[in-house]
Regions:
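Basic, Lys/Arg- and aromatic-enriched nucleic-acid-binding interface segment
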Residues: 222-250
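Conserved tyrosine-mediated DNA breakage-rejoining catalytic core shared by Y-recombinases
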Residues: 246, 255-289
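Short, basic (Lys/Arg/His-rich) helix/loop patches that form interaction surfaces
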Residues: 281, 325-369
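Short, polar N-cap/turn motifs at the start of nucleic acid-interacting alpha helices
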Residues: 260-263, 319, 332, 342, ...
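N-terminal core-binding DNA-recognition domain of tyrosine recombinases/integrases
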Residues: 10-101, 112-128, 133-211, 226
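Catalytic-site neighborhood detector that most strongly recognizes the C-terminal catalytic loop/helix
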Residues: 214, 272, 371, 375-396
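C-terminal catalytic core of Y-nucleophile DNA break-rejoin enzymes
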Residues: 275-292, 306-328
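C-terminal secondary-structure termini that scaffold catalytic or DNA-interacting sites
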Residues: 398-410
Length: 410
């Protein structure tokens, strides 16, 4: 393994960390790890993965190995690509990950074509394309492991073994099957015979949707009480106010620009990441005040035009993971959603706003516009939690005989 580049330029990495405000202890860990790598320089090393595995072999301290993995990964990115570390992102090793990289050329070609096909037919959400590509890759890898080098050589047992265990119990979800089907349908244009054959073998699974969890009035009260204290930073208060009063997606919060806020017209304008459609939201007083306080008092001075910036150097726009972390922190401080299985995420605020609008008899197209949906049918899942109107649909059973002690009828 050639460590010449690292040996000649590692001081640039150290100087960058000093100039970016990294702590002395953090810089020391990097310098220590670089020194150990350069001093050892074992002939058996062919990659940074080998370097890490060497330290795994001589240490059983999991805490020590955890920081070594992060540091060695960052050193690799610097050595190979000249990229400096970002302390808000844990670097892993530069190595092919996922089933796709283990597929033969035939299956890789199908996945590649699906991605092109998905964009062509107007699938705009990258996460959907990535998710379906991943499901298809894992499915193809399973077939490949069973000796099926292409779809034409695949039999029904090969396909069903992916979805069912040896006892015939279902081990894959309907959503997984739907994703695999999407990849195969796209592949009809590349391998019509093989894809059509495997499509016929796919099981017909019914997708069962669970009722959407929602924030209770008591939980909302606790969140509002927390917002009235000085426990949260102005940035976090502004983010929670946006989630609570606009139902905006977390990914759209991080993409908000300073110019997105029209203070004169009291509106927020943005292009949604999911639908690529323009959305205009009213700038409510509580939201506007929280944003103004953050921007004028706490927001770091930097060259970025994103509204929300990291609180520590190196300053940069927030990532969506940070929004999720803020929500988790707020729920913890408010002492809500602490039980196992409780849903925690930004979508809870979106659900809450939708249900409240439904309770006020707001028309579905209006709700869809507020939430930025492309179709009014997107609101349908929320109707299952509109208990206010569902109660009106309940039929009285007072005319039917009920055994005493089952329940009381007032």
């Amino acid at each position: 393994m050639d460590l010449t580049n690292l040996r000649q330029h590692h001081e640039e990495l150290v100087n960058h960390m000093k100039n970016s405000g990294y702590s002395t202890s953090c810089i020391y860990m990097y310098k220590r790890q670089i020194r150990e790598i350069l001093d050892l320089d074992l002939e058996s090393w062919t990659s940074y993965q080998d370097i890490y595995q060497y330290f795994v072999s001589i240490s059983s301290n999991q805490k020590d190995l955890k920081w070594r993995r992060s540091v060695i990964g960052s050193i690799e990115y610097f050595d190979i690509y000249g990229l400096f570390p970002d302390r808000r992102r844990i670097c892993s090793f530069i190595e092919p990950r996922g089933a796709y990289h283990s597929l033969n050329h035939v299956y890789q070609q199908l996945i590649d074509y699906y991605k092109t096909y998905a964009e062509r037919i107007g699938k705009t959400k990258d996460t959907t394309i990535d998710s379906e590509s991943h499901s298809g890759s894992v499915f193809f890898y399973h077939l490949q492991q069973r000796g099926c080098c292409n779809l034409e050589s695949t039999e029904e047992d090969d396909v069903l073994s992916y979805f069912l265990d040896e006892s015939g119990n279902l081990i894959r979800s309907a959503a997984c099957c739907k994703s695999v089907r999407a990849v195969l349908k796209a592949g009809l244009e590349v391998d019509p015979i093989g894809c059509k054959k495997v499509l016929l073998f796919l099981p017909h699974l019914t997708e069962h949707r669970k009722n959407i969890q929602m924030l209770t009035d008591d939980e909302i009260c606790k969140i509002n009480q927390l917002l009235d204290t000085d426990t949260l930073s102005l940035r976090d208060k502004a983010i929670i106010n946006l989630l609570l009063h606009t139902g905006i997606r977390g990914v759209d919060i991080i993409n908000l620009k300073l110019q997105s806020i029209d203070w004169n017209s009291d509106v927020i304008r943005l292009i949604q990441s999911k639908t690529k459609k323009e959305l205009e939201l009213p700038l409510l007083p509580s939201v506007g005040n929280a944003l103004y306080d953050y921007i004028t008092i706490e927001r770091p001075k930097c060259s970025f035009d994103a509204v929300f910036i990291s609180a520590v150097v190196p300053y940069e726009p927030l990532k969506v993971q940070t929004i999720r972390w803020i929500v988790r922190k707020v729920f913890g401080l408010a002492n809500i959603r602490m039980n196992k299985g409780d849903r925690i995420g930004t979508h809870l605020f979106r659900h809450h706003l939708t249900v409240k609008l439904l309770e006020k008899d707001t028309a579905l197209p209006v709700i869809s516009n507020i939430l930025g949906h492309t179709s009014p049918k997107s609101v349908d899942p929320y109707l299952h939690t509109d208990f206010h109107h569902l109660k009106e649909c309940a039929l009285s059973i007072e005319s039917y005989p009920v055994r005493k002690g089952v329940f009381d009828i007032d």
